[in-house]
Regions:
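Catalytic-core regions of hydrolytic enzymes
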Residues: 22-154, 177, 181, 240, ...
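Extracytoplasmic
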Residues: 283-294, 305-374
């Protein structure tokens, strides 16, 4: 029972995000959050006198510097720029990193790590993880994962944990899955151009990705347990090449999102010209009452690229009760429940809605469109 309560508590903390989140993709890529994995009391893997936390930070700073120099319209937010931790409790530390990303209204989250094999010095290569659960993991891959900070992963062998996590994974994938996978594929493509061994993209129930409300990846830049790769990822040349590969991936990703917004953006409605007034009508034509342009607040439960029937079974117990509103961007169809005069009242309804839709959050609507409201 205590274990279940702990999982539920983390789940609620993970969802305690800024209410204005959720429009990350629809607004384009304006804020990129770079997370240098580990830090402070959490060194990560250690081989040959080198600590993973330092390698991660050096690459993160190089990547951020490239974006800041060459992409002036994109803001870079770092979870850390020095050797520090946010809590001596690892789970709280991971949550703090996600909180930084969410509070910054991040549009893309990149977590940088290095790998290690507990039993093999020959294993090498690069891989990128996205939020999910793979049923095809080999025992070797699982050994690598759980030897390196098991606490960073949800234990999906526990049925209580798995049920909660899978529900949230489904919603994350529905909203951001396409974009996370696109970024992961770009990263692996640019790694491969360097001649690195491509270990591919893997779906894993990572706590830090679970708690971020935006497209997110965690990339493993090489194996510290392999002497050749350790030398490479610790060298200035190796770190610059890795940072450049990530930077080129970011550029392509930003272009991809921009293109998707242009394709998916709703076209302005063409209204027919009003019919001329009859000649015999002398008094001024009566004007219809103006529709209220007052902003109201509601709880968004789902977003989609295409229209969904409000009676769709995916809405569960809210089937037939949800309403549709439009927004700019790729996922322009938003579905919500309830209408409230102020944000506080809408936020009070969120806990109830999250029993069915764990990713639910508050949005503001004006004139039939989702608007940004602080």
């Amino acid at each position: 029972m205590n274990r279940l309560l702990t999982i539920i508590l983390f789940f609620l903390l993970a969802l305690g995000i800024n209410e204005s989140q959720g429009e990350n993709v629809a607004q384009g890529v304006k804020v990129i959050v770079i997370d240098a994995g580990h830090g402070g009391a959490f060194p990560g893997a250690s081989y040959g006198g080198y600590a993973e936390k330092n390698i991660n930070l050096q690459i993160a700073l190089k990547l951020g510097g490239m974006i800041e120099k060459n992409m002036p319209n994109v803001k870079v937010v770092y979870t850390r720029k020095t050797d520090k931790h946010f809590s001596k409790n690892l789970r709280a530390d991971l949550q703090a990193r996600a909180d930084i990303a969410n509070n910054a209204n991040g549009d893309l989250f990149i977590s940088i790590h290095a790998n290690a094999h507990p039993k093999s010095t020959a294993t090498r290569g690069v891989e990128t993880l996205i939020m999910g659960e793979s049923k095809l993991e080999t025992s070797e891959n699982e050994a690598i994962l759980f030897a390196n900070n098991k606490e960073e992963f949800f234990d999906m062998s526990d049925k209580s944990t798995a049920a909660i996590v899978r529900a949230h994974i489904q919603n994350l994938q529905f909203t951001y899955g396409e974009y996370s996978e696109v970024m992961a594929r770009l990263v692996q493509k640019h790694y491969a151009k360097l001649g690195r061994v491509n270990r591919g993209i893997r779906k894993q129930p990572l706590r830090v990705l679970y708690a971020t409300d935006m497209p997110s990846i965690l990339t493993e830049v090489g194996f510290m347990s392999n002497s050749a790769e350790l030398k490479y990822i610790c060298s200035e040349k190796g770190q610059m090449e890795i940072a450049t590969a990530l930077y080129e991936s970011v550029k392509e990703y930003v272009a991809y999102v921009k293109k998707s917004l242009l394709i998916e953006a709703p076209q302005p409605e063409v209204k027919p010209a009003p019919a001329p007034a009859p000649q015999q009508q002398n008094k001024p034509k009566e004007q219809p009452a103006a529709k209220s342009s007052k902003t109201y607040y509601t709880v968004q439960v789902m977003a989609s690229k295409s229209a969904i029937s409000t009676s769709d079974s995916r809405f569960g117990s809210y089937k037939g009760k949800v309403k549709q509103v439009r927004a700019d961007g790729a996922f322009s169809y938003k579905y919500y429940v309830g209408e409230y005069a102020d944000r506080k009242a809408a936020q009070a309804a969120v806990p109830t809605v999250r029993k069915v839709f764990p990713q639910a959050f508050v949005i503001a609507v004006k004139d039939g469109r989702v608007v940004t409201s602080k």
